[in-house]
């Protein structure tokens, strides 16, 4: 597991929110290029490696992670030198206050900032209790004396603010705590998939990579599926674990078979294919029906694309400290590799046989 943790640490500590995925894209391009026939981007910056099949009428199978994590963008510099920001992606306001972040200026200068909070001493007039903060009311503080000093460091509206967090192992060495597993899980998964298939001749043309701007409305998936026109779309994404709250999604219990979420209902034949494949491969899996992934956008593009998500769950996602099991990654990895190898023309036609 040490080698896997090192890979996880490297990729989760990269910084990149929607619209600013360039660090992840550069890393991803370097990792995937040796294992594919060609690398292409879409008009928003999604990056995909293509392995061409030698077979006529080979189906086009798209495997897509997303590069972006949640963060913030500076909207205003106040006269006192603190910063207002808008959320890029979904945030629970309760997890934002008193956390360390990194602000990146236009010239890529990294500036440490913290998110503001109200100490209990200032709440005593309100019976000592704090009201629920609103995301838009939270300020970011870099210790600047005033607006002029903040601007002298190159800070302007539009600069990005990203959680500062180091990836660590839990005491039992089975789990990781980090930021951005949603969705660096997917980026690492696709990288490992392409490496494992380096010497394989597939019965499909594989288009594997990562979209941009998933966290702000599944935007990249709409562009990439239009460009690459897949017959089958497999999102690779991380979802919230509900095990602490007695809900679906338990860490350590394997990959997720997501038969429903508010943006996507899995087709019957796709569900049958996934269950049969998981059982034949001996993959540990669990059922899941929450959240949302790029499959929600992809399945509606072109004339309709059968889609699903190959995922894992993690506790406390969209925060500085997400906790997840490395074995779940390995189960999902085995599942995805088996799926991709099985998706030949007859299997794809069966899934699409209405």
Each PLM stretch: what is its role?
Residues 1-354:
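N-terminal hydrophobic/helix-forming segments and targeting peptides
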